[in-house]
Every structure is written in structure tokens, then in C-alpha cells.
Amino acid sequence: MILKSFIPGNLISLYMTIINSVVMVGLYYGFLTTLSIGPSYIFLLRARFMEEGEEGTEKRVSATTGFIAGQLMMFISIYYVPLHLALGKPHTITVLALPYLLFHFFWNNHKDFFDHRRPTRNSMRNLSIQCVFLNNLIIQLFNHFILPSSMLARLVNIYMFRCNNNMLFVTSSFVGWLIGHILLMKWVGLVLVWIQQNNLIRSNVLIRSNKYLVSEFRNSMARIFSILLFITCVYYLGRIPSPILTKKLKGISEPEEVGESEEERNIEIETISEGGGANQKQGTEENTSSSLFSEEEVDPSKETEKLRVTGKKKKKIKGEFHFRFKETYYKNRPVYETSYLDGNQESSKLEILKKKEDKYLLWIEKPLVTLLFDSKRWNRPLRYIKNDRVENAIKNEMSQYFFYTCQSDGKEKISFTYPPSLATFGEMIQKKIYFFTPEKWFSDELYTDWSFINELKRRNLSKEFIKRVESLDKESFDLGILEKRTRFSNNETKREYLPKLYDPFLHGPYRGRIKKWGSPLSINQTYKKKNTDPSWINKIHALLLTTDYHDLEQTLDTLNIKSLATEKELSLLTLTEDEQGDSEDRVKILKFLFNIVITNPNNQTIRKKSIGIKEISKKVPRWSYKLIDDLEQQEGENEENVTAEHEIRSRKSKRVVIFTNNQANADTYTNTKDAIDPDQTDEVALIRYSQQSDFRRDIIKGSMRAQRRKTITWELFQANVHSPLCLDRVDKPLFFSFDISGPLKRISRNWICKNKESKISDYTEKKIEKKDEAKREKYKREEKMRIEIAEAWDSLLLAQVIRGSVLITQSILRKYIILPSLIIVKNIARMLLFQFPEWSEDLTDWNREMHVKCTYNGVQLSETEFPKNWLTDGIQIKILFPFCLKPWHRFKLQPSHKDPMKKKKGQKNDFCFLTVWGMETELPFGSPRKRRSFFEPIFKELKKKIKKWKTKCFIALTILKEKTKLFRKASKETKKWITQSILFLKGIIKELSKINPIPFFGLREPYELGETKKDSIISNKMIHKSSLQIQSMSWTNYSLTEKKIKDLTKRTNTIKNQIQKILIIKDKKNEFLTQEINSSSNKISYQDKILESSKKFWQIVKRRNIRLIRKFYFFINFFIEKIYMDILLYIINIPRTNTQLFLESTKKMIENFIHNNEANQERINKTTKNTTHFISTIKTSLSSLSNISIRNKNEKAFCDLSSLSQAYVFYKLSQTQVISFYKFKPILQYHGTSLFLKNEIKDYFEERGVSHSRLRHHYGLRQKIVWHSGMNEWKNWLRSRYQYDLVQNRWLKLGPGQWRNGVNQHYLAQNKHLPKWDSDEKERLIHYEKKNDFQANSLLTQEYKLNQEQKYKKSNFKKHYGYDFLSYKSINYQDKRDPYAYGSPFQVNKREESSYHYNMDKQNFFDTLRDIPIHNYLGEGDILDAMGNFSHRKFFNWRILDFCLRNKVDIESWVDTSTKSKKNIKTVVKNYQIIDKMDLFYFTIYQDQESNPSNKKGSHFDWMGLNEEILSHPIPNLELWFFPEFVLLYNAYKVKPWIIPIKLLLFNFNGNRNINKNIIENKKRDSLIAPNEKQIIGLENRNQEEKEPIGEGGLVSDAQKQGNFKSVLSNQEKDVEEDYDKSDKKKRRKKKQYKSNTEAELDFFLKRYLRFQLRWDDSLNQRIINNIKVYCLLLRLINPNEIVISSIQRGEMNLDILMIQKDLTLRELMKKGILIIDPVRLSVKNDGQFILYQTISILLVHKNKHQINQRYQEKNYIDKNHFYEFIARHQKMTENKDKNHYDLFVPENILSPNHRRELRIRISFNSRDKNGMHRNAVFLNNVKNCGQVLTKNKHLDSDKKKLIKLKFFLWPNYRLEDLACMNRYWFNTNNGSRFSMIRIRMYPRLKIR
């Protein structure tokens, strides 16, 4: 066994056990708290550093002892509440701590305090040692409250909740802290010893030079610690609210409660139970016998839990139990007189102070305490949370509930469902009645009893359910089969029920928010008879009253109809006779307990006769102040209401007055009403906000700003204040930033320049974008720099005064000293240079310069007027037309072809701002701009003249050079002639020399010379010739290449000539010598041949070289260009060829499409100049399509796929596994308005198995389909619930559960075309051909014989119809009468068809464009009423039709309600005359030429805003579109069809005043419904109109309709005018008189319907500000023409804004783009209901389930006689001729929803075997019976049976629904939030077989 303990696994488990033990964890956290070194260590370290000797040792010991004792008290105070409260009181800390620390500081500064060191015999009597002990003790106690406790110290408090044995954890943590403290002190001692013994310190030169330095430092240590202590005190004094200096806020009176007078003021009993620490929460499982009780007068602003005890005087006692945390420490500061409850005694003494005693006990204390510590004052920087529903700010206090143990599933578990006051009071009562309890139940017994009770209830419910199913199997349709709805009855005999809203047993539309019973237990019947009102039982009764569930359950007979009917509540409210005796004892206990609470010496008869408890209500904790900010104060002043001064500090801003209108002087603006006060001035001001961080952030005056969080600034000027935790998220750190973008840009720029030729155009665009981005970054940097400079001037003290004075000085110097001096100097210089002076021109420019005084942000005022408070707020000086000194003035006309951008750039210099240094800048605080230099034009002129002189000199030099060339040429010719003459003379001399042979050798040299000259002359001629050829053929003589070629040619010729000379000389020598020597002639001839051949060879080489050199450069260029062209052509041809292929394929597809849709092409509307409306055109096509489909029954007839959803097509394509996307590649890649070839898509779906129809089987297409059966069955089941897909605002219009009753009535009674979709006939019968493979069959047929293949086809066909229902709904969109594109064997007669078409269109105008069936549920009675349902809507839909109508409007007067029958009825909408004239709503479109002008039907309201001009949308090929209207409808497809355009929101209420003249209203067709009529009026009207023929009731005359529509508009205006008065009376105390209708319209619009943001356009905002700046200047000028023209040229003034009229309507403002409407989310009242029904809508049992069971609002009113009549009526509505028991389709529906959920929940609770058999035992054992019920009903299809067997009895189907409704059943609470997940216990996962 010993060896086994050393196994690694056992060692690890042992190690983990030791580590996770309470002792080790306590030691660890206690050791960590040692590291939380705070200011409490100051005294301890000072004793270590300063004290020496025997007394120093004693002081060190006393300091350590006091420090440890203080820390021990802190640990004890965590669990000892009185000590914690005493240490944590704000009074104690503020009054005692700071004076003590300040006193200690001044005491320590006494000179002889630390100097006297007399030894004493009893050291503990020494005052200094005692003070050291007390200092360390007290400062340690203050550490957690007045000084900051670090996070490490709080870990002990945080971890306390995780330990079961609290005291053991505290002890171990203290021991750990002690160990850590000892180690820390030892380490400090070692450091001191090391410092004293270190040789380096001793040998230091400074210390050796001053040997008394160490002793002086030791003596001054006391002062150093005193200074540190003083700094700490001052710092934390700033963080504690000053009791005297804080601002006193003006409180407002609380709303008085009804029936409560001053005598009946509530007495508040408070139990303060606080934990020590910032987030310490006191658990109620601790010993509360030592809780501190205290009381004070009622504070109506605090959260109270009222235990109201009814009596004669109705005295109210409120018990309030507060848990105060560190976060809310300074909020509430009540004064308490404490008294203790002795928990060991049998009776407690609860001392309650009387008001008479309060008067003389608190008259001295209360004013002082209120002055020092006002709990209602905003001393701490708290947020003021505004709420429209609650006037005052809500206190940020503790939650209403907290974690407490409660019984759940028979076990005690922690639940977040308990108010702390109730938990504390219940625990107190438990301690008081402990001796009454004979025995205590253990947890196992509790669980066994609970499980037994749960099993018993489950068995009873199961038996009841089985019996009901068996009775169904016997076909006994007794009323007892269906469980009736239980009503809560007040009187059994008279059948008086509670109101439906407050009936806890009702659901659906009558479900209300009430507080149900907190426990199933109740008191006895005798007590119930005494009290007429039912008493609500709370958790206290669960402690006092116990009931034997065994006996209680036996009294309930689950199969007894009487117990399930109206008497059911009596069985729950009665007890058996055997228990009455026991209950008497409990009533005594009740009397004893509540007498404790109620007894008061002044009032002994509070509650003696009967004992009862009312509900525990909660009062919202609020502050007693209603604070306003600056904006609200100004709004109140504008509305002429008396407003208080604002208490909330807004962002730092300054009010800059830009215009002051003195009405005494301005006669044009004088009003007769305001003429009483002649000195009244009207100021126009702008608010200038500071650009720095908002350190105020809505802080309240008087609160301590030092306690604000997140007030750290990282930069000098930044937009927002950052938290220290977010510093790492800053883009650029301050110290470690290195911008490498500049070097990279330079490198990239150089690289671009080097490789310019190889770059393409894309890179050029990127380069431009980079340049633009660089410009933007530069602009941002400059703007940031300007903001920093402006804020620096604004933040420094007296900076604005200095800057303003300097600017004024600079302005005067510039205008009157500097510029005139420069003008004088310039003109004198011109006279000295013999130029004409320009005095007049310069003085004119100088006079034109204007120095305009501006506000700090640049708003122009005037030249003479200074801004208001300019010395403190700042000033700018703007220079208009700044003077620039020019050396001369020239009058040149600007050429017309000049670049306008350059002109604009030149005009930027028309104004500038003056800086402090006298410089000019473009923007305030910007960088100085470069001035135009005075000498720059002079230098330019000099440069021009120098350039001209250089040009002339160059021409002269060129001529001289040519002359020299001619001279050289002439000299060369002369030299040549002389040379030839000499040669001739030499020849003569040579001839003469032959006579005399003596001078032989002398005559040979001249001869040689002559031959050489001759050859040289010839060679020179050839060289000159070649050079001339090269020069003549060259294209660029002065290019570098030609120069190289010439040089090379000359060099080559020179070398060749030299070779020839040498050869010729040798030849001559040889020849001359051979004549003398007589050599052989053969050898000489051979050499001559060699020389001649070499000469020819070199000549050829020379010519070829010359030619090659001359052509090489052009050859290279041509070769490169050829390569480039080939590559470019190849690249261009690639997309061209691909485009051709694509166009050819597209052309083929379009031809096929046109060929397949020839019938559709003929029906495309041709646009003319008439007006048509899209509904009439669509319906014309629909009727023609339906006629074609009837004629072509046996042909291939498809409908136009006019509204196929792109999203759905892509979804189906993605879901299909065997599809090839190559065919749809062009469509998938096209992002615009995709021209779907919808017939091909449909065919492709059928071929690939995505959709199935008759055509698939008709053509014998049998392809294998790959499906995931399980997933697709689940998807199919979900998709079959399409009818629950309500639109959002209609869900919110409906009440909770209303769709089960009222909506379904509309659905079944009026809309017959939709039941055709949902009924078995139209869903399953799709025009079967009478063939062998697919015979005509009906679900009404009881038996059918098909072979296996036919059965497979039929089941497969039906199944895939369920899968592809959405596909058919989209593809076969236009045939509204049938979801398929084919006819049906069962066709209704024409009259019925017309009638239901008529009613469908009249009631369901929303379905004209979108085909969601649930839209047809609502009639005209269900139109959203904007007046009453704004608060119920999750989104404020400002496009709702009747957004400002008080009365509901019949949509028939607005919407086209005419339809065309197949053959007989041909009513066409044509009466659009009145609408086309009223441009308020409509736009003109083109009308169908084929429409009949004789038949007219009603006016048409453009509710979609789609009647725009077709010509405004260019369509090059209309044949590619299905209808012209759908081009316009494409954008509306993205918008929900229940909305109207934004332009209709801005309804011009005053635009149609003239319409209501001379109008004859047709009372028979009045479109206004009275407001007191019910919603069923639509149902009644519809039923009446169904009986009328279509031809009679469906058509009215033009005059009636015109008058009707005009009456609607006139009534709207009347309603609007009435709404003006109502809104003014409600929202204004003093009614404001409107000066114009526009103002009234805007005010009414903003007040009643401003649920969205009206914001300005950003660019418009800047333009308006610029205009305002110019206006302020122009209003002060006498002759503003010049300034106006220059402002317009500079772009400062925008003429578009000047065109905005004063009386523009909202519609026109919207049209101009001035106002932009943004919808805003609203707080929703019924948000929980919306989420609930959205969640469980897909989990409802079947789409036909609601058609019968929830048609009737009260099922208990159904009797047996009307049962079959009800079924027959239902069948008639669903167009089924046999009896159809839809409600019995699911056997579980027999039970009521509450019992249904209860049965499932109880089955799941008892599923001990995890395989799921036990929980479904009831259902699994009775599946056969269910099957029998289903098989006997032959009309039910097999798919439904399979669906039941597979899905209906599985637990996961209902899990979400059960969780959604769990609050109502399991917890017996109905607080309106059925998704409060903190109260729902999630069940364990159950296995699904």
C-alpha cells in the first residue's frame, strides 16, 4: 500500500489535492497580498531605517506588532460585519482619518520629537513607542478605505466565495500574509546591513569628505517620511469629496403617491450587510444573527422592497435590505442608530425609533450630517443617466436579484432569482421558527419527495392523454376529448371570470403581463372567504406552510372534465379537511412572526383581525435631482420656459457672437410685438468647441474630477481621452516612431524614373493615387499642427490677450507704416533709375487692402468692429486683397485660352490671415506662405535681356565661324595651287637634271615628294566625298551618333591613306631601284598584283563599314519597335478573340431564348406618350398568359419568369451537387442587373433534379438525383413552415398569439386563393396527364392502384415539390392562382374566381409585388396604425403608408384593386388623371396602348414609388426584358414591399389646400374609417362584398373616385391641423405662436414623428459655414459688391445655398439634398414577443395545424351540435368536400398547450435511463393507436403520416419551444420577458435514436 502511493498517477492526484486545498490556496493568496505595498508601509519602513539602539529595537518591534495587528483586523473585518461597517463608514474615514494624518504630520515636524532618546525603565510607557504602534495599526486599517488597495490585496476577498470553509481560508491567508511579511522585513534588514557594511560606500570620496553625511541623512529621514506622508494625504484629500466646498444641487420633489399623505410616510427598515473590498458581495448563507439593523426616515430615491400589510389605517412598512459595495460607496451616506438582534433568544427586540424622538435626537445631528455628507449629492463623478420614462436619473445601485439557494428539481441550487431583502428576511424568520420545526428534511429526502411528486403528475397527465387518444380511436367525438381552455373564475355560480388581460390561464392575444403565484401552495378556504381579494403567496409562505403533495394530488382527477374546466382553480386553492388542524398552528406562527414586524408602541392595532401579505413591489432607485445640460437650458430659454441653471458640464466651448442686430436701428427687422423694448438686441452666435480631449464628459458640477476614470492623455492634443489599457492600441507610439515612408517614396521615385519606359498605365494610376494620398496626409499633418497651435494659445493663461494685442499692433504697422514706407522707397528708386513713378497705382492697391477683424475660428465681422470678448476668446485678422509691392505695373489682358485652374490658383492670393510675426498665412495658425519677392520680376527681366544678348552673340559667332571656314577653304585652295606649281617646276627641274647625273640623289627626293602629294590629293578628294555623302544622308547632324560615325570614318580613311602612302613610296623606291640594278621583272609584277588586290579589298571594307555604321542605329530601333508591336498586337487580340467567342455564344443563347418566348415578346409593352401603371400591365400579361395556358393544355407552356430571385437561384445552384457551373458562368460573374434566361434555368433545374414537374415525367427524363436524405428532409420540414414567415412590422402589429385566432380567421374566411396553395388539392395535384405512367389522382380518393414505379414517381414527385416549393413560388411567380405553371383538374367557377380575386387584391395590396402568403392574412382592418403602434415596433419604419393619419384609410382609394378574369371581366385601370396632375406623389410614366379607356377603376396610389419615367432608364433592347415595368421594379425588389419612398415621408401638408374646394364626397365609398371601429370591419366588408357580383360592386365612376381621393387628402390635412394643436397642448406649457405654416409643419413633424436623425450633408455643412462667414461681413459693409464678386470667384460663397428659400418644405429640402434621413433603432416594448414567435415559428407542428384549433378564440364555447358545422365550414374554406379533421392530425394537440409542455417536461425530468426510452414511453407505446387514427382518415396523405412517425414525438423538436415558454409554466412567472435565460435551467442533452 505504501508503494502504491508512489505511483505517478497517485502522486499527481495527491499533489493536486494538496494544491487545491483551502489551506494552500489561502497561503498562496495571503503571500501575494504581501506584495501589495501601499502607503501603510511608510511607518514600518521608517522604523526600520531610523531607529537604533535599544529603543530603536523596541520601536521596530512595536511597529511590526501594530502592522500585523492592523492586517489581522482587516482580515477579520471581511467576515465580521460590525467591524467592517465601522471601518467602512464614509463618516469615519473622512472625519477621523484625514485629521489624524494631518495632525501626525505636524507633530512629526516638531524639532525634539525624534531627537530625545532618553532611556526609560518601562519602554511601553514611552509615548513615542505607543505612537509607533498606533500609527502602524491605524494606517493599516486606513489602507483599504482611504488609501488605494491594490489588486493583490483584493484577491483574498474575491477568492472567498469559492471556499466552503470561510474561516479556515481567512486563517490560512493571514498565515500566508504573515510569512510573506516576515520574509519582506528580513529582506529589508539585509539590504540595510549591506548598505552599512559595503566598502564601496565607505570609501566614497563624498562620504569621506563629509563624515557627518550619513548621520545627517539619518536625522533628516524623519522629515523625508513626513513629506511623503503629507503628499499622500494631500493627494487622497483631492480624491475625497470636500464636505464644505461641494456644490449644493437644487432637488426637486418626488412624485407623490396616490392616497399617501404626510402622516403616512413610510418607515424604512434597513439591514446593511456589507462585504469588505471593492467587489465584495455578502452571501446570505452566512450567520446573519449579528446583522446590524438601522433605520432612518424614508428616502424615496432608494430601492425598497415594500412588505405592505393591509389594515384599517393602511400603514405601510417598507423593509429595505441593502448590500453596499465599494463601487457605490459614496452614493448613499445615511446616519444609522444601531441596535442588535440576539439570535439565541426566542423573541427578538426590534427597536424602532419614533418620529417624536427623531425630532429632538436628530435636530442637531441631521443638519450637520447633511451639510457634511449628503448622500444625494453628486460628489462622485457618476454618470447622469437620463430616461424619458423616468424623470430623474436612475441610481446605479445593486441588482434587484442576486444568487441564492432555492429548490430546483428537488435539490438546493444557486439561482439568480432572489431579492436580497427577501432572502435576508426569510433567513431571519427561519432562525426564529427553528424551534417550531420538529424535523429537518435532508437533501436526499427532498429529492425523493420531489421526484415522486413529479412522477405522479406525469403519470396522471399520461393517463389522461392515453384515454383521450383511445377515445379518438373509437371515433367518439365528445367534447371531453378536446381539452377546453381553463378560465380563472371569481364566482362559480355566476361564471364571473377575470378580465382576459389578467387571466393567467389564457394565452394568445389575451396573454397579459401579470404576477402569478410564487408557490403552488395556498392558505385555507376559510381565510379565502374572509378576504374578497385573492392573496398572492410569496416565498415566505413556502417557509411557513407545507403541504403534503401526496394527499393534494389525490384530490385532482385528471380525467374529470369539471376539474379541467372553470372550477380548476378552486382545486388548487383548497386544502383537505385533515390539514385544517395543522394549518391553525401555522396561522399562529404567522401571527407571531408578523406581529414582530408590525408591532409599534404608538399603533398597537395595525393588523389584528386578519393576516395577509400583498405583493412585493419594487421602486426604481432614483436621485432626487433632475439635472440639465447647457443645450437643454438653451432650449428652455428659446421656448420661453423658466429653466434652471445647467448642472451637467458639456464639452468645453465658447460662444462666439458673429452678428448683433439692434432692433432699434434696424427698421426692416422690427416686429410690432417686440417694439416695446427698443434696446433689445438679437445676437447670432456660433459655438466653438475646443479641439482637445473632453475631460468633462458630462461631469456634474461639484463632483470630484480627480476620481474620473480613463483621463490619461498620450499626446499633448488628441481627440479623445484614452484609457491606460488602450495605449498599446495607439497607431503611433510617441517615442518609438520612425517614419520610413519618405525614404521609400524617394527610392521608388528614382526607380520609376530609371524604368520609365517599361512601366504601364496601371502603375501611372497608382502613382497618381499615391501622390493624392501623400497630399492628403500632408494636409492632415498641417491641420493637426494648426489645431495644436490654436489649442496652445487657447490653453495658456493670458495668451489670447497677448496674441490679440500683438495682432492689432502688426496690423497697424503693416497698414500704416511698413507698406507706405515701401511704396515711397520704390518710387524714389524708379525716379533715380530714370523711370516714371507709380504713385497712383500703388496707393490704389494699398487702399484696396482691407484688414477685417474675425473671430477666433475665422468668421469675418468688419474692419472696425471687434469680436465680443476678443481679448479672452481670441481674434483673427483677415487681410482681403493683400497688398504686394511690384517693381512696375503692367496692364495686360489675360488670354482667353489660359487654364482656368491656374486662374483659380492665382485667385487664392486674394485673402490671407495675419500672424503674430507679421507674416501671411492661408489659414489661421498655418505655416507662413512665401511672399512674392520684389526683386524677382527684376531678375526675370534681366535674365530675359541677357538671354537675348546671348542669342545675338551666338548668331554673330556663327557667322564669324562660317567666314573663317570660307577663309580656310580659300587658303587651302591657294595652298593647293601653289603646291601644284611647285610640282610642275620640280618636274621641269627633274627633266633638266637628267642631263647632269651628278645630283642624282638630291633630285630623287623632290620627285618622291611630288608623287606623294599627288596621291594625297586624290585620297583627300575621296575622303571629302565620303564625308559629304554621310552628311547628306544623315538626319541629325548634331546628334552624338553622327559625330561618332564621322570621327570613325575620318580615322579609318586616315589610316588607310597612310598605308597607301607607305606602299606607294615603297613601290616607287623598288621601281626606281630596279631600273638601276636591273632586277627580275616577274617578281615586281607579282608584288604589284598583291598591292592592287589589297587596295581593292580595303576599299570594299571601307565602304561596307561606312554603310553598316550609318544604318546600324536605325536598324536597332526598327527591330525593337517590331518586337513591341508584335507583342502588343498579340495581347490585344487575346481578349478580342475571347470576346468574339463570348458574344457568339451569348447571341446563340439570346436567339434560343427569343425563340422559346415568342408569345411573351408579343406581349411586351411598347412605350408611348400615354401613361400606364405597372399593375395594369402586369395583369394584362397575366390574363393573356392564363388564357394561353388554358388553350395549350397539351403543349409545352411555361410562364414568364419575371421575378426570379437571384439570391434563391444562387442558393439552389450551390445546393445542387450534380450541377455544372460552366453554363452559368457568365451569369454568375455578372454583378449588374443579370438578364436571367429563366426558361433555360427552369429546364436546367428539371434536368438536373433541382426542380420536378410534369414536364420531367412527360418527357421521360430520368436522371439520378443525389440528395442527402436526412438533411433535406429536415430542410423540407422547415421550408414547409413558410406561412409563418411574417414580415417584421406585421409581427409587431399583431398581439402576442394573435396569429392563432384573428389573423387565421382572415386567412380562412376571405383569401380563397391561398388555401388553394395550402390545401391538399393544389399542393399535390398538378394537372396530371391521363397516362399510364402518371394518372390523374386526388387525395380525396380513398384507394388507388399503381405499380411500384408509379408509386415511386408519385412519392418522389410530391416530396420534391415540398423541397422546391420556394423554387416554384419564384419561377411560376405570375400565376397567382396556382403555385404551378399548369392547370388543375379542379377549377372553380368563374364567378367565384373573380370574387376571390377581387377580394384578394382589395385586401392584400401588399401582395401585388411580393408573393409571401402570410401577407394575405391581414385585411384593411389590420393596416398599421402609426398613431398607436410606434412603441411596439422594433424599427420605426418611417416609410409606413399612413404615417401621420389619425384615422385609418381604405387602401382601395390608393391602390389599384381591379383584376381581370380569364374571359368575362375585363376591367382595366385607366383613371390616372387626378394622380398625374398631383406631382406630390406621382411621376408620369407611359401607358399601355392596348388598354380600354372605357373601363375605369379607382385611383392608384404610388405606394412603391415606382411609377417613374421609363425613358429616364435607357434600355437599348427592350426585347431582352420581360416587362418594361420590371426595369423600374428592380431597385424596388431590394426594398421591402410594405414601404413607400422617402419622398412621401416629407409630405407637403400645405400643397393641396385648393383641392378640397367644390368637391362632392361620395359617402357610400368613403375611405376614412372611424377610429372607434374594430379591426373586424375589414372582415365584415369583405364578406358583404363577396356576395355581390364583380361587375356591379367592383366598378365606380371617375367622378366618385376623384372626389374620393381628394376627400382623402383634405381629411388628411384636417387631421394634421388638429394634430398641431394637440401636440402643442401636450408638449408645451406655454403655447408658442408660429410665424409661418412651414415652422408649424416642421415643429409638428419633429415632435411627433422624429424617430430618426435629421442630419446635414457634410459637404453642405461646410458650405453653409463658409456662407455664414461671408454673410457676417457683407451685412456690415455699405457697398458689398466688390466683396461679393470676389467671394464668389474664390468659391467662399455658394450660390446654390443662396437659392434655399425661407419657406421650403421638408420634401424640397430633402430633394435638394440638404436634409438626410437616417432611421434610428427604438426601444421596443414587445421585443420579447417578437423574438419568441420568430424563434418558434419554424417549430410549429404543421402548417395546417393552426387552421382549426386556433380559429376560435374560446374553445370551451364549442358544443357538440356545432362541431360538425365547424368542420364543414373549415372544409368549405379550404375547398375540400369531405370531413377533414385537421386538429386531430397530431394526437398531442388534444391537450392544451400548457399541459402539453408540462407532460414533455416531466417526461424529460424522469429520464434516468439515458437512452431516451422512458421519456417517450407514452408515445412509443401508442404509436399504433395514432397510426390507426391516421389510417382511418383516408384523406390524409402518406407523407404526413411519415412525418408524424419520424419527427413529431422526438424531444429536440420541442426543446426550443419549451425553453421559450418555460417561464410561464415552470417558474410560474410571467414578467413579459420569456427569454430571460438566467431563469431557465437548461436540460441535459438527450440521446436521439
Curated annotation (Swiss-Prot):
Source organism: Gossypium barbadense (Sea Island cotton)
Feature: compositional bias, Acidic residues: 255-265
Principal localisation: plastid
Residue numbers spanned by region Disordered: 255-303, 1610-1633
Keyword Membrane part of the UniProt annotation: yes
Subcellular localization, as worded in the UniProt entry: Plastid, Chloroplast inner membrane
Keywords per UniProt: Chloroplast, Membrane, Plastid, Plastid inner membrane, Protein transport, Transmembrane, Transmembrane helix, Transport
One cellular component (GO) term of this entry: chloroplast inner membrane
Compositionally biased region (Polar residues): 279-293
Name recorded for this polypeptide: Protein TIC 214
BP GO annotations: protein transport
Function per UniProt: Involved in protein precursor import into chloroplasts. May be part of an intermediate translocation complex acting as a protein-conducting channel at the inner envelope.
